[in-house]
Amino acid sequence: MPEETQTQDQPMEEEEVETFAFQAEIAQLMSLIINTFYSNKEIFLRELISNSSDALDKIWYESLTDPSKLDSGKELHINLIPNKQDQTLTIVDTGIGMTKADLINNLGTIAKSGTKAFMEALQAGADISMIGQFGVSFYSAYLVAEKVTVITKHNDDEQYAWESSAGGSFTVRTDTGERMGRGTKVILHLKEDQTEYLEEQRIKEIVKKHSQLIGYPITLFVEKECDKEVSDDETEEKEDKEEEKEKEEKESKDKPEIEDVGSDEEEEKKDGDKKKKKTKEKYIDQEELNKTKPIWTRNPDDITNEEYGEFCKNLTNDWEDHLAVKHFSVEGQLEFRALLFVP
């Protein structure tokens, strides 16, 4: 483990924050990503979702031999949470998570074998979208974020938080915030000119374009408003009831019981006079974005013509039925499965 560049003496009750320097090649890569203009910055979301999918694959594979691995969370999913007020976009998965050592090594101090090769490719004019092929896709977050916070929980370790504004160093600390059963939360603090990635339609567009066939559900959480009709005096309802109760108690002591035959009519008239007004009420809307599943992985005998048709329409945005489909696989030195549609 690398030596810390800073030691902070703090009281035991405060969080201990450790600061580490980025490995030289990673620092150069981040500088290149931040300071070079790229038109297709949207690929950051594809890469982070792909990382989440890989983490979910890992915990799923481990659970095949040890089902108790999922005791910290049975559901395997990815959530996308835009927050316009805080100007953050959060990607949450219930994957394998990272230990403290994973955070330090994987996100900064040990360069991947493809780091240098990717930098050379970028400088030679390669497209930034190739970043995932070189094992450094996490750093694509800095295409749109000025600061990134990673909160993670692995079954074998405590919950930790990693944070960096790409200034040559990053911090790691024990996280005492909201508890995670298991998984990773990547919080992107977006740049002022990148807030388009907080818009519901923009996120849906990117997921459909790049991540539609991810094997785990991707759910978008969006805060919305709806109109709620309330009466003018609804907010004062409690006070009115208390006053009425006090009045009734006082009258019951001072007067004999007399039936008021006109009280019902007066009450009905009073209710009819109450005016209604509309107020805005906020709620969180949840929508699964990748309902189209990779049907080529299934047995062709189990797939109906309707399922083939729905898959083709979602993939091509065509409203007409396809003419024919061929679903086949090849096994040998090279193995693959394929779907061939004739429109």
Curated annotation (Swiss-Prot):
Keywords: ATP-binding, Chaperone, Cytoplasm, Hydroxylation, Nucleotide-binding, Phosphoprotein, Stress response. The modification N6-(2-hydroxyisobutyryl)lysine is found at residue 112. GO terms for molecular function: ATP binding; ATP hydrolysis activity; ATP-dependent protein folding chaperone; unfolded protein binding. Residues 227-285 are annotated as: Disordered. GO terms for cellular component: cytosol; extracellular exosome; perinuclear region of cytoplasm; plasma membrane; protein-containing complex. ATP binds at residues 51, 93, 112, 138. The keyword Kinase does not apply. Its main location: cytoplasm. Residues 247-258 have a biased composition (Basic and acidic residues). Residues 230-246, 259-268 have a biased composition (Acidic residues). The keyword Nucleotide-binding applies. It holds the Pfam family HATPase_c_3. PROSITE patterns: HSP90 (PS00298). The modification Phosphoserine is found at residue 263. It is found in: Cytoplasm. GO terms for biological process: cellular response to heat; protein folding; protein stabilization. CDD domains: HATPase_Hsp90-like. Putative molecular chaperone that may promote the maturation, structural maintenance and proper regulation of specific target proteins. Homodimer. Belongs to the heat shock protein 90 family. This is Heat shock protein HSP 90-alpha A2. It comes from Homo sapiens (Human). The gene is HSP90AA2P.
